[in-house]
Amino acid sequence: VMNCTWHPVQTLRTDDRQGRILTKLTENRISAICMHTNLDAAEGGVNDVLAQKLGLEGLTPLTEEKIGRIGTLKCEMPLVEFTRFVIESLGCNGLRYTDCGKPVHRVAVGGGACGDYIPQAIAAGCDTFVTSDLRYHDFLDTTELHLIDAGHFPTEDVICEPLVAYLQRAFPTAIVMKTAAHDCEAIQYCIKEK
């Protein structure tokens, strides 16, 4: 039996949730493969799938470490239309964004918390950066491109189905593989009605 996750293992302490889960796996002789940054950077990984979900073409890495991707839309799109497209494509409950006054065409993506890569997106000439966990001052200080915070879960969860399909092709005689039933967006939104 094997458990495959992309949560990074930082400690093996039994006084926190992750440590207790890992201890239980070990006690029951269940292997664990914990992918995180390597799955973000991998060809066909989180960022490739995220970019493809958003219809981006001509993908290149955002960083030297191959974190994030840059691509272009077939046709440029007004920002409001693109934000609705992001919500629909990723199944977001909502998102936060800023408007830099340009149409959306050259887009950088970073699954999970990639706000530290805003300078790379700007340097690459992107007009939009889709990621998550952006800080207030990221939004306030960035005027060169649209920032779209689509949420941590929606920007990473895109890899689950393709990863299961890949593992099933690689190990066709293995026991049934599936994604966790309880894994879902932890953050809910209450939006002021106009």
Task: Annotate the PLM regions.
Residues V1-K194:
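Active-site catalytic microenvironments in core metabolic enzymes, especially phosphate/sugar-handling
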